[in-house]
């Protein structure tokens, strides 16, 4: 294929690389409260909630960068001079039908737990 670098499954064309950042690497479904961990060298780039869902207060939603992406470990305030972001805890409910975007390495639902997590690079 023209434009493809040789050397293995992890080498992508520009278009394939862009698709990978949008969750086209794959997805995982969770209908319980077990933790989901992203595959090696990958992250979860979006989460769609099938049912109303909460996360464990500690370790429930682990961001690649807790300053940039909403998470349960710290209040995300990504830009200099920004404020007002709060740390997620088990009192925050994400309603069915909502999709959130970010870069997370682990998703650990506390309740509800009908969700689809989309995998990207």
Specify the residue positions occupied by each region the protein language model found.
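Glycine-centered loop/turn motifs
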Residues: 17-19, 32-41, 52-53, 58-59, ...
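Extracellular beta-sheet-rich ligand-binding/adhesion modules
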Residues: 46, 63, 69-76, 88-97
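C-terminal interaction-tip segments
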Residues: 1-41, 111-121
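Hydrophobic beta-strand segments within beta-rich accessory/binding domains
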Residues: 45-47, 107
């Amino acid at each position: 294929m023209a434009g493809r670098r040789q050397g293995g499954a992890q080498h992508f064309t520009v278009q394939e690389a862009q698709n990978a950042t949008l969750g086209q690497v794959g997805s995982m479904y969770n209908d319980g409260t077990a933790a989901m961990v992203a595959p090696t060298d990958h992250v979860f780039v979006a989460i769609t909630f099938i049912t109303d869902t909460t996360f464990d207060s500690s370790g429930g939603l682990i961001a690649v960068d807790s300053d940039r992406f909403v998470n349960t470990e710290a209040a995300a305030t990504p830009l200099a001079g920004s404020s007002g972001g709060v740390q997620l805890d088990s009192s925050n409910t994400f309603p069915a039908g909502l999709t959130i975007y970010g870069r997370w390495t682990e998703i650990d639902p506390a309740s509800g737990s009908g969700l689809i997590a989309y995998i990207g690079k």
